[in-house]
Amino acid sequence: MTLRWTKEASPRWDADKRRLFGPAELAAVGLAPPGPGELVADEWWRVTDGDGVVGYGWLDTEWGDARITFFVAPGRRGRGVGDFILEHLEAEAAARGVNYIYNVVPETHPDGPWIKNWLSMHGFREAPRGQLHRQVQATPTRAQARASDSPR
């Protein structure tokens, strides 16, 4: 499986996002469903393979840190797509000089315990206000090298 990481120049709420981000998932991270075709905030990347869109990564840089969120198509979970997205989001954060990446998993999230465990296994530590954070790697990875070369 060859995964591709593509930045969305003008991210909009479309059928693929609706398919992956159900109302419960959006509500769990404090977002209301946008209208069809509506612009969505911050930076978005889509992950594709030969079968189409299999995931999304989202990054919001603020005060030297970056909040990240990512979604993987249910049929593709457990196959490395989440690892791929996390590696690329960290590369994007490093290219922007970010110190920490973090994710907030609300208590109401339908898969909260599983996600917290997965993030913990990937080096994230719990912090106040329900955040799980991890320091951005100083040593560039292949994904970071690609991110620094990609257009913003």
Please state what every model-predicted region is.
Residues 12-28, 45-47, 86-91, 124:
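Compositionally biased, non-globular sequence tracts
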Residues 110-119:
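Short, low-order "capping/linker" segments at domain edges
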Residues 93-108:
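Conserved GNAT acetyl-CoA-binding A-motif
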Residues 69-78, 107:
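A short, internal acetyl-CoA/4′-phosphopantetheine-binding micro-motif in the GNAT/acyltransferase core
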Residues 78-94, 117:
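Conserved acetyl-CoA-binding loop-helix of GNAT-fold acetyltransferases
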Residues 46, 51-60, 67:
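Conserved beta-strand in the GNAT
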